[in-house]
Amino acid sequence: MGANASNYPHSCSPRVGGNSQAQQTFIGTSSYSQQGYGCESKLYSLDHGHEKPQDKKKRTSGLATLKKKFIKRRKSNRSADHAKQMRELLSGWDVRDVNALVEEYEGTSALKELSLQASLARPEARTLQKDMADLYEDKYCTDVDLIFQETCFPVHRAILAARCPFFKTLLSSSPEYGAEIIMDISTAGIDMPMFSALLHYLYTGEFGMEDSRFQNVDILVQLSEEFGTPNPLDVDMRGLFDYMCYYDVVLSFSSDSELVEAFGGNQNCLDEELKAHKAIISARSPFFRNLLQRRIRTGEEITDRTLRTPTRIILDESIIPKKYAKVILHCMYTDVVDLSVLHCSPSVGSLSEVQALVAGKPNMTRAEEAMELYHIALFLEFNMLAQGCEDIIAESISLDTLIAVLKWSSHPYGSKWVHRQAVHFLCEELSQVMTSDVFYELSKDHLLTAIQSDYLQASEQDILKYLIKWGEHQLMKRIADREPNLLSGTAHSVNKRGVKRRDLDIEELREILSSLLPFVRIEHILPINSEVLSDAMKRGLISTPPSDMLPTAEGGKSNAWLRQKNAGIYVRPRLFSPYVEEAKSVLDEMMVEQTDLVRLRMVRMSNVPDTLYMVSNAMPQCCHMISHQQISSNQSSPPSVVANEIPVPRLLIMKDMVRRLQELRHTEQVQRAYALNCGEGATVSYEIQIRVLREFGLADAAAELLQNPHKFFPDERFGDESPLLTMRQPGRCRVNSTPTAETMFTDLDSFVAFHPPLPPPPPPYHPPATPIHNQLKAGWKQRPPSHHPSRSFSYPCNHSLFHCRTAPKPGPPPVYLPGVKVAPPDCTNTTGLGRQTVAAAAAAAAASAAIIPEKQVCPQPVLNDLMPDIAMGVSTLSLKDRRLPELAADTELCQTVSEAGTGPPQHLSCIPQRHTNTSRKKPTLEQKADGRENQQEYPDLYDFSNAACRPSTPAPGRHSPSPAHGRYFGPDLYSHNKASPNGLKSVYLPGQTSPKKQEDPRREYPPSPDGHPHRQKREPIRLDVVEQPPQRPDFPSAASENASHGPAHVRARTAVETDLTFGLTSNRPPSHSACSSEVLEERSSRRLTDSEPLGHGAHQRNADLERGDSISRGRRSPSKPDFLYKKSAL
């Protein structure tokens, strides 16, 4: 019996013997073939149900009325009525809608196949071959030793004698217990490993080692001539059971419990004995193995060996009835559960038989015997016998036994596997069950389980009709139970005279059906003008009309059979085979008459939520990937139980479960289900998860083990982690590994292209130099670069810069200054992942020298981390319009400086820059001119233009530090829109490719009236971003220089500034306007010794910055009524 349904035998199991006719079908009248549950053919065969009314018709007398004849004919043609109703429904539909309905049915059919496989899954039972292999390896209960090449091989006399004629003759010469027999093998080339493999073959029927000598035909012929050719293992074991040669244990049964406890009372009280072998019963049952080992420890076994008598085991017949003993032994030797052996053995009345005689019941049925034997198998821990009994019970399910099997399997001591098969039979045969008296004996729980299924084989109208009848029958039973005992059994009792329908209490009937009617899919009742539905609404059993009667937002009517927007919660139609067949037939006809396959393409509505917060809430259940939930900070250790009652399995078992889950995900059947069920990935994932749980013997409630294994094993990796997940700090957030390899960066170099487009730029972020972070980065494997991610990715990247980046060489560990607070690493920070600039390093030194108390430090940028989709929405507005002209300007800068400069330093590289939003309306040129007269220090946070994103350069009257104070003439970090004045160009490394080679035609802005380009009038912000500089050898010197002038740069927060605006305005206070020009010239000349034209461009750029400062400050004045704050793009 395999662990999954794909390895199961078809209808009957080889372990089940006896009635061959009952073995031809698995459950009821259908077999569990996949073809029988698809939409290609009828989902379930009910042919025998159509013959039943015809048989009754033959037996009716000639006095039957014409009305009854019409009723019987109408019942026999029920399936034809269903097809007609579906055809009438689809008569006015568009061909695309019919195709959508058929696709929905196909998706449901794929889910049904997975559900069927999950219902058939159960743990794999150990076979005779596996138990015999363990018996040879563990060597318990051995009784003879073979000596070969000075090596002792403990073996079992009975097994070798039954399997090999050579050993049968050899062992008969030494019958005593523990005899040592020296082996003398004449076949050449047999060594000790090969001899051990030969013994393993006699135990299991297979060689236990891979040896090329066993492929040699000559050696095999010589071995067969000397030892003989053994029969198949099952044949020899059956012969051993029949003849019981060399038996060494006797099973005795007694109904006197005191005798069993005393062990050694009057032997006349013992009944007939059964012979067996210790090796076999201990190998198959842990119960007998522990019993025999306990006898060895207590010394009782030595007494039996001394007296040369078989070991006697006395069993209490109230626990293990004697009539089942032979069936148990037969299964131990043959792996077959044959109840025919039960009727051949003498029956000593068991407790169940006594109860049956007292109650006046007939003999036990085959299913009842299997139920009783199932409990004995669980007691003996004999799984093969238990699963064989389950097969017998499942095969016996029919209309007559359905109620008994459902009740037995619903109990805690029943079989959950049998219960799933009984519920499946109820769902498949519900149309037949509803028309029989068995339907009224069903409990409410069983009915509720059935009507919740998407695979119910009944129409919604019949379900509603017979549910009401079932409720009326239950109400009548209540009335009968409430009547006085005096009337019971008389002509005036309710059971005799009956109760009319109008006499039933509607309120009480509604209370009985209150938990069942909500699961009737009223929107799918056919015909639309159903009398059953209208009657139920008149009686008040159904209070709300179907959604077809409710108008939608468009003013039309919603189609409850299809997925539509603004149509409320969608409930898929049941996979009722007559409806499915007729829908496919109608689609085939419409395709031939109206259209071809190309015109059938349409957008399928799925269950993907429209709101972002719904995604995070649904991820742990909906995602088919394994989710990762770290242990919270207040939790000291991972939980030891799941679902409050199930112990967490061992790590080895957990890894096997995850491996099995990954294996199932890659099967063609599961992939087809994922493809056909758009937006239903949660259902597909859950089906394969519970299948794996059942294969490993765990309850369905333990699904969290597979949905979130990292919660229970936080230190383990299960094969689906990505670099982004490993960068998270434990206990910070919950992450689901949903992105695939095509849409997720898996290398450090790909982080260079990240441009979090949230204006203004984020405040400083300090990645820590922790050894764990370095180990994780070192552990990432290099993967081939994937194609550029689409714009749907949370962080839009600069595609043109992908190929002009080289991986940075690992530099020295970063040095942190005193007072600088170490913060966790930021995945969205490009410079923090290996690339530093002169501006970033100098700004870090300036900030460290002029450090402010922690209360004034800006908060860490977490918006990109928590809401990447909002960042995506802001960035996509300007990504296309801004990138092309910006890169064009940068390309010209790179080329000119590379020609003028002799050798650019490595840190003067082109850095990916931040994009801003340009969707607002631009003010006219006249408004810009007027705005120059008003100068303010406060930037407009709601203005996302280029000028608004840059602080104004101070006027000549203010202190303006030179580039040596932390400024840099290269490309700006956060904008591509700044062109250097007077021909100053950016510098690229020799190994880098200019973006001009990547970008073709560039769009340029129209020039302004004063001759300068339009974008030159908007001087951008130059924020001092504090970053860690891993590759800055001149960092200490820069820090010392800025430290000498540190107090001059410290500026406290003004009264009108807030946490958002502090640090974004000019950081050069007017109190220090007098600065030595010699110091400025000295530092400028020291930095620009290699290039004279570079110095000239610096002075010209200073003038332009000062002129642009007055323009931008006046234009952004918040006090002017003409220039109100612009509307935020967020």
UniProtKB/Swiss-Prot annotation:
SMART domains: BACK, BTB
Entry-linked Pfam families: BACK (PF07707), BTB (PF00651)
Domain of life per record: Eukaryota
Alphabetized CDD domains for the sequence: BACK_BTBD7, BTB1_POZ_BTBD7, BTB2_POZ_BTBD7
Comp. bias (Basic and acidic residues): 923-935, 996-1005, 1080-1090, 1101-1112
Primary localization class, coarse: nucleus
BTB domain: residues covered: 142-211, 247-341
Gene for this chain: Btbd7
Free-text function comment from the UniProt entry: Acts as a mediator of epithelial dynamics and organ branching by promoting cleft progression. Induced following accumulation of fibronectin in forming clefts, leading to local expression of the cell-scattering SNAIL2 and suppression of E-cadherin levels, thereby altering cell morphology and reducing cell-cell adhesion. This stimulates cell separation at the base of forming clefts by local, dynamic intercellular gap formation and promotes cleft progression.
Name of this chain's protein: BTB/POZ domain-containing protein 7
Example of a GO cellular component annotation carried by this entry: nucleus
